[in-house]
Amino acid sequence: MDSTYCFSHKHIFGIEQMSTEDIVHILDTAQSFKEISERSIKKVPTLRGKTVVNLFLEPSTRTRLSFEVAGKRLSADTFNISGSTSSTTKGETLVDTARNIEAMRPDAIVLRHSSSGAAQILAKHIDASIINAGDGTHEHPSQALLDMMTVRDNFGSIKGLIITIIGDIAHSRVALSDIIGFTKMGATVRLAGPATFIPMGIEAMGVEVYSSVAEAVQDANVVMALRIQKERQNDPLIPSLREYSICYGVNKKLLERAADDVIIMHPGPVNRGVELNPDVADGKGSVILDQVTNGVAVRMALLYLVAGGNRNGEEQGV
């Protein structure tokens, strides 16, 4: 990387805003933080005195917990607000909620919201750094970064790999962020799924679209399955889950077409027997739990980079 490079983003809205250098810098930073999670005492004073608010106005388990763990391991004061406990349930707008939080002078707000672009709207009204933890069907940058970290851990480099994503592409913010990220890093991205799950014109993003799952996984280095986002669909877009599993579920027979060293990924939650057979989810090549582990490291890196942590010297413990 250029020795003059400097990470200059105050906010993390999406992978689209990032350069290749930004992505590499985040992944390298996350790699240095990953070692902390292997220690007997999993804590460093990097963000001591900093305040992080996790504002999750849409249901989440993995992402919310991952950001909370990340903040605590960096010694930040972390506070969690969910949709059910926020004043938005009483009619308060997102901006008013954020302004009230801002009055308490947090250093960073991690936001999950059902509306695309919510993080950008928030950033126009408050001074704290905003990290997008998922906004509608727009982006989920930290998930894409942990996915890229997991792939890089397994192959050393992302460039030249074939990444096959199967499932509900149209309603998945993970898919969009992964497409942008892996493409920027030099991978070939293939998409497969029912026609109702593939956005029209998505080929313009530089991806290859397949109607045949078997062809999509041919020689693939990475096979990523996505769940059906029923909460974002007004009407059912497939005949049944059983038929979906038969036609698009990832099983051992299908993976015989992939590269010998193929890895299996899923952003979670996994619907076993639908998008992934249990023997695949738990079998050789599955790196689903590695994704979870890397998620903490990536989110530590993001919090450090936007909240102004100090990592100079041995005393910082990194």
UniProtKB/Swiss-Prot annotation:
PROSITE patterns: CARBAMOYLTRANSFERASE. L-aspartate binds at residues 90, 173, 227. It holds the Pfam family OTCace. Keywords: Pyrimidine biosynthesis, Transferase. The keyword Cell wall biogenesis/degradation does not apply. Pathway: Pyrimidine metabolism; UMP biosynthesis via de novo pathway; (S)-dihydroorotate from bicarbonate: step 2/3. One of its GO terms (molecular function) is amino acid binding. InterPro entries: Asp/Orn_carbamoyltranf_P-bd, Asp/Orn_carbamoylTrfase, Asp/Orn_carbamoylTrfase_sf, Asp_carbamoyltransf, Asp_carbamoyltransf_Asp/Orn-bd. GO terms for cellular component: cytosol. It catalyses: carbamoyl phosphate + L-aspartate = N-carbamoyl-L-aspartate + phosphate + H(+). Gene3D superfamilies: Aspartate/ornithine carbamoyltransferase (3.40.50.1370). Carbamoyl phosphate binds at residues 62-63, 112, 140, 143, 268-269. Its EC number is 2.1.3.2. It is an enzyme of class 2 (transferase). Heterododecamer (2C3:3R2) of six catalytic PyrB chains organized as two trimers (C3), and six regulatory PyrI chains organized as three dimers (R2). Belongs to the aspartate/ornithine carbamoyltransferase superfamily. ATCase family. HAMAP family: Asp_carb_tr. This is Aspartate carbamoyltransferase catalytic subunit. It comes from Desulfotalea psychrophila (strain LSv54 / DSM 12343). The lineage of its organism: Bacteria, Pseudomonadati, Thermodesulfobacteriota, Desulfobulbia, Desulfobulbales.
